[in-house]
From Swiss-Prot:
<dbReference type="Pfam" id="PF24137">
    <property type="entry name" value="DA_N"/>
</dbReference>
<feature type="region of interest" description="Beta-barrel motif">
    <location>
        <begin position="216"/>
        <end position="374"/>
    </location>
</feature>
<dbReference type="GO" id="GO:0016853">
    <property type="term" value="F:isomerase activity"/>
</dbReference>
<protein>
    <recommendedName>
        <fullName>Diels-Alderase fsa2</fullName>
        <ecNumber>5.5.1.-</ecNumber>
    </recommendedName>
</protein>
<comment type="similarity">
    <text>Belongs to the Diels-Alderase family.</text>
</comment>
<dbReference type="Pfam" id="PF22903">
    <property type="entry name" value="DA_C"/>
</dbReference>
<keyword id="KW-0413">Isomerase</keyword>
<dbReference type="InterPro" id="IPR054499">
    <property type="entry name" value="DA_C"/>
</dbReference>
<feature type="region of interest" description="Beta-sandwich motif">
    <location>
        <begin position="1"/>
        <end position="216"/>
    </location>
</feature>
<comment type="pathway">
    <text>Mycotoxin biosynthesis.</text>
</comment>
<comment type="function">
    <text>Diels-Alderase; part of the gene cluster that mediates the biosynthesis of the HIV-1 integrase inhibitor equisetin and of fusarisetin A, both trans-fused decalin-containing tetramic acids showing also antimicrobial activity. The PKS module of fsa1 together with the enoylreductase fsa3 catalyze the formation of the polyketide unit which is then conjugated to L-serine by the condensation domain of the fsa1 NRPS module. Activity of the Dieckmann cyclase domain (RED) results in release of the Dieckmann product intermediate.</text>
</comment>
Length: 374
């Protein structure tokens, strides 16, 4: 019999009032198996995140699979499914499952299933031990059924770089650059038949693995996420601002690849005024082109229309890469505060980009997300 390690959670027994230490980060690994294996404390959370976007028609899919104490309110651990079609129609469900089981075998294959035995429904994922591929299966009758497949693109993985996002979060990209396919049947409450969603051969995306012993409000007050392919460049960004009153500095876990080669490893957030870059760094500034026609913004108080992204190689003669990011379509708007003129929220975007190093002007698309906590 093969050697299998299992982490089995039930929502009524696996959320702890006590302090629980996560297992250690494993350098060079995808760290896909849970870090809280027998119970998770109320402040902690774990996320398995998958996305894909078509460069041809800008259709996109985003999946978030979680373990955290939010499950107590809803009777299950959450899986979020977001879809946007080429015609900009969207579909979003937050689904909750009483059981969450993740296993890893002696070959390193990790399987996870979030399930509800009563309704005979589940959403599951599997990731190869060598991180060459991952897949998801959606089996929630009358809601969502289908599958999603990610295949790692050749080149550097970035797994041998620092995975810390500030002092309290680990942010790993087991499959940071992938070709993605998906075929889903999606049901709406007012529809008698399923709508079909297909993400074909022109789609790119990836898989992220994130965890922390602290809740998001304890970690940050604002964040921006981006994964994109722009000509020969692949870009991955997560940047957070610490809570008000914190002594922590803004943090990032940002990577830039060119033709599969990792060319900039940014853990530091800087400004253009910083004279000497002693580390690979990220400059991220908001754009406000609200006077232009057809601008897209989030649904809350932050009305930026996009970002300017600059990767800066360390040293006086370090190379720079600059990209303009424009919000093209909204995938979701989720509030993080009460309604009102000063309301905050979380918005997902289809992002359109252009840029490169000096003399380059490549174009591309990606998925982005910005969140502000009140």
């Amino acid at each position: 019999m093969s050697n299998v390690t299992v982490s089995a959670f039930t929502v009524d027994k696996s959320i702890s009032e006590e302090h629980v230490l996560p297992s250690s980060f494993i350098p060079g690994s995808g760290n896909i198996f849970p870090k809280f294996t027998s119970a998770i404390p109320k402040t902690a959370w774990e996320l398995w995140y998958f996305d894909g976007i078509s460069k041809d028609d800008k259709s996109s899919i985003v999946i978030g699979v979680t373990r955290n104490a939010e499950g107590l309110k809803h009777g299950g651990f959450k899986v979020q499914v977001f879809v946007i079609w080429a015609d900009e129609r969207t579909w979003h469900r937050d689904l909750f499952f009483p059981e969450s089981v993740v296993s890893i075998n002696e070959s390193g294959v990790t399987d996870g299933i979030w399930k509800d035995a009563t309704s005979n429904s589940s959403i599951s994922f599997s990731c190869a031990g060598d991180l060459s591929k991952a897949s998801l299966v959606f089996d929630v009758p009358g809601v969502v059924q289908g599958d999603m497949h990610l295949e790692a693109l050749p080149g550097d993985t970035g797994l041998d770089t620092d995975a810390r996002l500030g002092p309290s979060v680990y942010y790993v990209r087991p499959i940071g650059r992938a070709s993605v396919k998906a075929q889903l049947s999606l049901y709406s409450s007012d529809a008698t038949a399923a709508e079909q969603f297909s993400l074909g051969t022109s789609a790119n995306g990836g898989m992220d693995r994130v965890w922390s012993p602290l809740s998001w409000p304890q970690v940050m007050t604002e964040s921006y996420y981006l994964r994109t392919q722009v000509g020969p460049y692949a870009m991955q960004i997560m940047r957070i601002f610490p809570p008000a009153g914190s002594e922590d500095q803004p943090s990032t876990m940002a990577r830039l690849y060119r033709e599969g080669q990792l060319v900039c490893v940014a853990q530091h957030v800087v400004t253009r005024e910083d004279a000497l870059m002693t580390h690979d760094s990220l400059i991220l500034s908001k754009q406000d082109n609200s006077d232009s026609e057809d601008v897209v913004t989030g649904g809350y108080r932050d009305k930026n229309t996009g970002y300017t992204v600059e990767f800066v190689e360390k040293g006086n003669e370090g190379q720079r890469w600059k990209f303009q990011v424009r919000h093209e379509r909204i995938i979701w708007n989720t509030p993080t505060s009460r309604p009102g003129p000063d309301a905050t929220g979380n918005t997902g975007f289809v992002e359109v980009l252009c840029g490169g190093t000096i003399g380059e002007s490549y174009e591309g698309v990606g998925t982005g997300g910005q969140c502000e906590l009140s």
